[in-house]
Amino acid sequence: MKTSFLAHSVAIVRSNFKGLLFTACIVIFAMYLSSVQSIKDTTHLAATAFAIIIGVLLSPWFFKYQHHFQAGVHFSAKKLLRLGIVLYGFNITLTELLSVGLKGFLLSAIVIFFVFIIALFVGTKIFKLDKETSMLVGAGSAICGAAAVLALESSLKSDPFKGILAVGTVVIFGLVFMFLYPIAFSLNLFPFFDQNAMGVFMGATLHEVANVAGAAEMAKDMAGFEQGASNVAVIIKMMRVILLVPFLLIVTYFFAKNQHSSSGKTAKSITIPYFAFAFLGMIVLNTYLASKESILGIATSDIISLGKTLCTLCIVFAMAALGLQIDFKKFLKSGSRVFGLAFVLGLVLIFGGYFLTLAFKGILW
């Protein structure tokens, strides 16, 4: 048993080695750029953003020699991606989720539901996009950015290029909003918002967890944002992240059911996102580890830190691989419509999120 497992592992490494090595070079450079303080202070870009940018710039070269690297790049975009999503559970504990309460859960669920439904309608009816692309952009805008896009793409087994387009939009609009929110709040452009309300608004409407953390940090410098308000923002965002699990199950089920009824496919086309359950299990494990000081002589804080580092590494690998697979001809042909949909959803998040936050003001805290 051990021998066969080892042989299988060696076979995987051999078949994917060139592509993994090539992707690893991009990952190392991306993580280096994100660690340089002057670059970090200027751009506020995470390693994930640098990875996809570098990947995009190198994509013409990759397509020229893809027969050498395709297997490893595909492995990074699929297998390492799922592992990264599972390990994302090391960023969340059940205690943090419960601290938000039922009303925080309700706010997050409303945002996800309406943004996704609007994405599906506007994307297919107005921008004439296919259903899968509309769903991917909607998931990225509604839940947790690139991680949600990639998780849904993996569940639906859709064309990777659709995921690449969707990831591009959520990365760009997430960064724009990350800078926009603190500036607008410092200029008092959000009437009736105190710091806690702004924290809820950030957590309920920003695309990525990194966007929420970045916006809250900038708000500290620009508007004297207190730590309590920053915590509210992150916790509300984490509630949206945890809702990724039921979201994947529900959407995958209905999408497969619709495909079956319209095209006569068998039930085998239904893909159960087991990694979503593993993600939930990792949250439970992280909660347990956080409650202990050490296990078998090893500090639990070190285990959690390792889990977070491996999560980041896997996601950065996946982002680099996705960037490499961008076909500029296809991108120029359909990218503008995808960005149009993401822009509309951005407006929905800003204005809809503003009024929703006001509606919940006084109940959430």
Swiss-Prot record:
InterPro entries in UniProt: UPF0324_pro
Keyword set includes Membrane: yes
Domain of life of the organism encoding this protein: Bacteria
Topological type in the membrane: Multi-pass membrane protein
Keywords of the record: Cell membrane, Membrane, Transmembrane, Transmembrane helix
Family listed: Belongs to the UPF0324 family.
Designated name of the protein: UPF0324 membrane protein Cj0999c
